[in-house]
Curated annotation (Swiss-Prot):
This is Lysophospholipid transporter LplT. It is a multi-pass membrane protein. The gene is lplT. Signal peptide: none annotated. CDD domains: MFS_MefA_like. Belongs to the major facilitator superfamily. LplT (TC 2.A.1.42) family. InterPro entries: LysoPLipid__transptr_LplT (IPR023727), MFS (IPR011701), MFS_trans_sf (IPR036259).
Length: 397
């Protein structure tokens, strides 16, 4: 496709529609593939501790490529970067379908996701401007939430029919995302001709990390969001083992329904935070963070499905109320110090590092034979204590 000189900045331009469709299909595939691959591990009798390791290889790719993916997105047409990234995801999903090692295939998907992330947000500013950019971000987030809900449930439901059906559906979703990327205009690269010296790129990224860590407000935000997303991913895997033990349900669909309750709650909590919390009153979100841990503790003791649904939605509401103001604080302060792109890249590194650490601890707990209910109780207690400590630190500084 030839390069476009004049960009149609309409919110519903052909290019914007292609971006939103590609994002939905790509995120749908990501979430469906997780639960489809977990079902494959169960069917092939992998040990239970290997389940969180699957996500660890995914986030490991994010961490490994964090210093470089931003420059990749800026050095080439972002639509083509998105196409390449979705192609990697398609290759990973297809390799799992055809019987290759699921951990290797899922690592390929993780590399694709790492490359995709900065390009998908960066292209919005190239396709729209002004107030339309805010609305475009809203459309992107709405399509992502819809994909998380539908993809998670589809992965579990289709896996109950047949694991290969679920895996094939994921590959088709990625193929659809690649096809949608074709319709994104080939815009000029934002910053072509940059140095590809790995050492210089790493040092530049390290400088951005240091700058944000030395600022009290951005450090507070980085720690808070990293704790939240690390805990959120760990909760996903906790549910997979908790459901058969606490509820006596052994299908693949029920954990995905429960995860969907958390996602719905996050949307509601995010809406409440937008109305009730400002950058000047960010500390209002901290009690919600502490309550997340308390509710996880009570949730772990449940043995009925309906209360479990209700408590997980409450966890989501508290989570949305907690994390949205912290995200806004980091973006605002980070934009003024290291730039919005660098701030997001550093945030991704922090969040994925927290995921890797928490999943590692969870996997170790399962490996040594600690029952899932005590793991849940300990997990909730430690999270509440960690957020309490963060709040005390923030008030003192």
């Amino acid at each position: 496709m030839s390069e476009s000189v004049h960009t149609n900045t309409s919110l519903w331009s052909k290019g914007m529609k292609a971006v939103i469709v590609a994002q939905f299909l790509s995120a749908f595939g990501d979430n469906a593939l997780l639960f489809a691959t977990l079902a494959l591990l169960k069917a092939q009798f992998y040990p239970e501790w290997s389940q969180p390791v699957l996500q660890m290889v995914f986030v490991g790719a994010y961490i490994l490529f964090a210093p470089f993916v931003g420059q990749v997105a800026d050095s080439f047409a972002k639509g083509r970067v998105m196409m390449f990234a979705n192609g990697l995801k398609l290759l990973g999903a297809a390799s799992i379908c055809f019987g290759f090692n699921p951990f290797v295939g899922y690592t390929l998907v993780g590399i694709g996701a790492a490359a995709y992330s900065p390009a998908k947000y960066g292209i919005l500013g190239e396709l729209t401007t002004g107030d339309k950019l805010v609305k475009a971000n809203g459309l992107m987030e709405a399509s992502t939430i819809a994909a998380i809900l539908l993809g998670s449930v589809a992965g579990g439901v289709l896996a109950d029919l047949h694991v290969l059906v679920a895996l094939a559906a994921c590959a088709l979703a990625y193929a659809g995302a690649v096809a949608a990327n074709i319709y994104i205009p080939k815009l000029a690269a934002a910053r072509p001709g940059q140095s590809w010296n790995v050492l210089k790129m790493t040092c530049s990224f390290k400088s951005a990390c240091t700058s944000l860590w030395q600022n009290g407000e951005t450090r507070f935000s980085l720690v808070g969001t990293s704790l939240f997303w690390g805990a959120g991913v760990t909760l996903r895997f906790l549910l997979v083992l908790w459901v058969p033990v606490a509820l006596g349900i052994t299908d693949n669909a029920t954990p995905t329904y429960l995860n969907a309750m958390v996602a719905i709650g996050i949307v509601l909590g995010a809406g409440a935070a937008a109305k009730l919390v400002t950058l000047e009153t960010v500390s209002r979100c901290m009690p919600a963070g502490i309550l997340i841990g308390v509710v996880v503790l009570f949730f772990s003791l449940q043995h009925e499905l309906l209360p479990a649904y209700a408590l997980l939605m409450l966890i989501g509401v508290l989570g949305g109320f907690f994390v949205v103001p912290l995200n806004a604080l980091l973006q605002e302060r980070g934009k003024k110090s290291v730039g919005a792109g660098n701030a997001i890249a550093v945030q991704n590194l922090g969040e994925n590092s927290a995921m890797l650490l928490m999943l590692g601890i969870y996997s170790l707990a399962v490996l040594v034979g600690i029952p899932v209910v005590p793991i849940g109780i300990g997990f909730g207690t430690l999270f509440a204590l960690a957020i309490t400590a963060l709040w005390i630190w923030q008030r003192r500084h």
